[in-house]
Amino acid sequence: MIEGRVQRVGFRASCNRRALDLGISGWVRNLSDGRVEVQAEGPPLALSELRAWCEVGPPGARVVRVTPSQLPITGDDWFEVRY
C-alpha cells in the first residue's frame, strides 16, 4: 500500500511503465480511501527497485508511507493498471 498524495498525479501509469521496464508482473490500482495498491512479482532486485521508485513516485506525488506485505505468487506474466 502506498499512502500520501498518490492519486491524480499519474502514479498508476508511471508505476505501470516502471514495472514493465523492470520485467515485473502484477498490477496497480487506486483505492477509494486515497491510497494506491500495488501487487508485484519478479526477481528480488527488480522488486527492490520498484519499491524504491514507489517510495518517491512520479513528479507531483508526495509519498508518506509504503507498506509491503507478502502475498501468494500468482504466476502472471504481465503488469496492468486496474480500475
UniProtKB/Swiss-Prot annotation:
EC numbers for this chain: 3.6.1.7
Enzyme class: hydrolase
Reactions catalysed, as given in the entry: an acyl phosphate + H2O = a carboxylate + phosphate + H(+)
Keywords: Hydrolase
Domain Acylphosphatase-like: residue ranges: 1-83
Pfam families for this protein: Acylphosphatase (PF00708)
Active site (catalytic residues): 12, 30
InterPro entries, sorted: Acylphosphatase, Acylphosphatase-like_dom, Acylphosphatase-like_dom_sf, Acylphosphatase_CS
Family: Belongs to the acylphosphatase family.
Name under which the protein is recorded: Acylphosphatase
Organism annotation: Synechococcus sp. (strain CC9605)
